[in-house]
From Swiss-Prot:
InterPro entries: HD, Homeodomain-like_sf, KN_HD, Ustilago_mating
Function: The B locus has at least 25 alleles, and any combination of two different B alleles yields a multimeric regulatory protein, that activates genes responsible for the pathogenicity and for the sexual development of the fungus within the corn plant.
Name listed for the protein in its UniProt record: Mating-type locus allele B5 protein
Residue stretches of biased makeup (Low complexity): 206-222
Region (Highly conserved between B alleles): 111-410
Residue ranges of the annotated DNA-binding region, renumbered to this chain: 107-184
Gene3D superfamilies, per database record: Homeodomain-like (1.10.10.60)
Cellular location(s): Nucleus
Length: 410
């Protein structure tokens, strides 16, 4: 048609029929051709309409063909719009259902969720409600249900783990607010006022270009983070205050996202504290917090009192005349040595009272009763002599023989 210099109603009708046929075939490669032909018709038709012959039959066919093309185009446009709308609704509905039942995507399934469960959903809820991490009773029950279902579906590393209960989840949130540092920020930078904490968190999220939950009109004229910090502190904000807040905030977000298992500082300090002293049964284990991450101070163990019990030792110079308390002295082999006998002999010789003293009235008494009475009402246990039998006449003549006796004081 484009090569024919003569423009007529018949050629115009043929061009429309070609466009209709190619449009209904709906091939990817035909779309540029259809657009090109339509542009050529749009350019040539206004210049040649006045010169065309009036043929009512051909004009009627042109109107019918144009109407069919118009209906087909509108139908295709509506189908395309409906397809886009349905895709959007399906995606939105699927996302809503997945969020409601907390169905993880395939990329997340590849992770070992057993390390995160059962705290996975609780940490996620904590981040979503960071301005007020106090779940309602309905939210608690929903979190418990999602956690237990996810644990069963993914498969926990500990199959004997009992299902999560509401009171356990409540305790987890209490502990999480403390260990993450949220309570510390509430106390230090929000005057322990949860309303101030809510506005402070929203201001921080806004300054970090993070999404914040919708809130009613604020009573504070400014949403600047520095203004909130200065107002809560009750004094002008210093760079040290701002840095302290940023550090506490980063530590809190890190704990909520990753927990203690993936943070080196927490488990190192916990491990050191656990190894320093074995806790007694029934005593709680010391737990480190974000604000108190310092190694536990070593305590010097109480010194055991030294025993004042004297070590018993035997005297090397036993004497029967001795009045000292030697009840704890025991006999030793050294007492039967010659050095002991020499010392005992000199002691006997220097004592006039002992020169005429015979400890054994009868030589056989020592064999019959090894325990004899000595001066001072002391009992002396004498062992049998190693030498031969002593003759009574030698004692009567004042001769004191050399006796190697092992004497034990009882």
């Amino acid at each position: 048609m484009s090569s024919d210099p003569n423009f007529s109603l018949t050629s115009f009708l043929e061009c429309l029929n070609e466009i209709e046929h190619e449009f209904l075939r709906d091939k990817e490669e035909n779309r540029p051709i259809i657009v090109r032909k339509l542009r050529e018709l749009q350019q040539k038709t206004p210049n040649h309409v006045a010169d065309l012959a009036h043929d009512s039959k051909t004009i009627e066919q042109i109107h019918q063909t144009a109407h069919r093309i118009k209906v087909a185009v509108k139908t295709f446009i509506r189908i395309d719009q409906k397809f886009v709308s349905l895709c959007s609704e399906v995606v939105h509905g699927t996302s809503k259902v997945m969020e409601e039942f907390n169905v993880v995507s395939p990329a997340v399934v590849c992770r070992n969720l057993s390390e995160d469960l059962p705290a996975y959903h609780m940490r996620k809820h904590f981040l979503l409600t960071l301005d007020n991490p106090y779940p309602t009773q309905e939210e608690k029950q929903n979190l418990v249900r999602l956690t237990n279902e996810s644990t069963v579906r993914v498969g926990s590393s500990n199959p004997a783990r009992p299902p999560l209960e509401v009171h356990q989840l409540t305790l987890w949130f209490i502990n999480a607010r403390r260990r993450s540092g949220w309570s510390h920020i509430l106390k230090k930078f929000a005057r322990e006022d949860r309303s101030r904490m809510k506005h402070l968190v929203r201001a921080k999220l806004s300054s970090s270009n993070q999404s914040t939950p919708p809130s009613p009109t604020s009573e504070y004229p400014s949403n600047n983070l520095d203004d909130f910090l200065s107002d809560n502190l009750g004094r002008p904000l210093t760079p040290a205050d701002k840095q302290q807040f940023e550090d506490d905030w980063a530590s809190m977000i890190s704990w909520i996202k990753y927990g203690v298992k993936e943070k080196v500082g927490d488990w190192v300090y916990d491990l050191c504290a656990a190894n320093k002293k074995t806790p007694k049964p029934g005593m709680p284990r010391p737990v480190t917090t974000v604000t108190k991450r310092q190694p536990a101070r070593k305590t010097k163990p109480a010194a055991k009192p030294k025993s004042r019990t004297a070590n018993p030792r035997a005297s090397t110079t036993p004497s029967i005349d001795s009045t000292l308390d030697s009840s704890k002295l025991e006999s030793t082999p050294e007492l039967s040595m010659c050095s002991t006998a020499d010392t005992s002999f000199s002691t006997f010789g220097s004592s006039l009272s002992m020169s005429h003293y015979n400890p054994f009235q009868d030589g056989n008494d020592i064999l019959q009763s090894p325990t004899v009475k000595a001066r001072g009402n002391r009992k002396v246990k004498a062992l049998p002599k190693r030498a031969g039998k002593q003759q009574p006449d030698e004692v009567d003549n004042g001769k004191i023989p050399f006796l190697c006796l092992s004497v034990a004081f009882v």
